[in-house]
Amino acid sequence: MSRLPETKLDILLARHAALEAQLLGPVNSEHYVKITRELAELNPLVDAVKAYRQVRDEIGDIDSLIADPDSDPELRAMAQAEHAALEEHEAELAQQIRIALLPKDAMDDRNVMLEVRAGTGGDEASLFAGDLFRMYEKFAALQGWSVEVISASEGAAGGFKEIIAEVKGRGAFAKLKFESGVHRVQRVPDTETQGRIHTSAATVAVMPEVEEVDVEIKQDDLKIDTMRAQGAGGQHVNKTESAIRITHLPTGIVVMMQDSRSQHKNRASAMNILRSRIYDAEQQRLDAARSAERKEKVGSGDRSERIRTYNFPQGRVTDHRINLTLYKLPQVIAGEALGELVDALTTDYQAAQLAAQGD
């Protein structure tokens, strides 16, 4: 394992001390918020660095005691027993520091544009898409985030053919970004009289909410159509052309929005989704090139990749990217144990990043 960058750690400690000193002086409310936010980000790393250096000093003292031929034999034996435990703790802290120093995804703190679509499996796929969306809703609530549905198309038997929502909360993209891909369910539908297990699927897309400065969209690249909103069966549900369809000509990405009676609101929502999809498409292209080079299992962003299976008869959830199986299906679907999968995927991704640094 590579040595820690001591000079960089010294700079971080100095920055932390300088920020704390600024708080003791006169500071306006806007600057105060910036300082406290940066301190909150630095605190875990600074605590780990201080603990690491303290343990390292203790190991040095013990080494001196063990090497001293005049030291008490009983004390030397006790020191040798403590030495192994301290070295293990030192290694744990060093790894914690390495992970904290990994490059941060600039989008990790962004809100999320979440899209869940029914795949193969007919009505059962729509029901499963509904289950997945509610799982994310409950998980978001546990994180203290909010979820706002932007557009929804309900399935004939319930659930959703497609649902698009905005998940708002600090770190939403960091925790949800590995959920993109094909989710498969194996269960006996309520309408199945023979007790046969059916397999169906739904596709999840998790995209960071991007701003105009993040993605440049030229007006000439857009084809905008307006129309009257339609309900189930295709009938018009209002007399004004409030529905809007925006096509991004260079990429062929199309966004249709009709949930609001206001064309202005539909257009704003459609542009938000379009920006996220354009950004996401470019990231998928870059990620595919990177993962092809590094053979990464997690983070490839491939929407066609089957990432997880929910087997109801066996009560298990298996994430195929990291070969992790949890026999906690009810808790996962309830959003309570989804965090275990999220944490495992994050740890695996961080391990891949550390390995890449060592290449």
From Swiss-Prot:
GO cellular component, one term: cytoplasm
Compartments it resides in: Cytoplasm
SMART domains the record matches: PCRF
A Pfam family annotated for this UniProt entry: PCRF
PTM (free text): Methylated by PrmC. Methylation increases the termination efficiency of RF1.
GO MF annotations in UniProt: translation release factor activity, codon specific
Positions of modified residues (N5-methylglutamine): 235
Keyword terms, alphabetized: Cytoplasm, Methylation, Protein biosynthesis
Annotated family: Belongs to the prokaryotic/mitochondrial release factor family.
HAMAP family: Rel_fac_1
Function, as annotated: Peptide chain release factor 1 directs the termination of translation in response to the peptide chain termination codons UAG and UAA.
Protein name: Peptide chain release factor 1
Lineage of source species: Bacteria, Pseudomonadati, Pseudomonadota, Alphaproteobacteria, Hyphomicrobiales
Gene: prfA
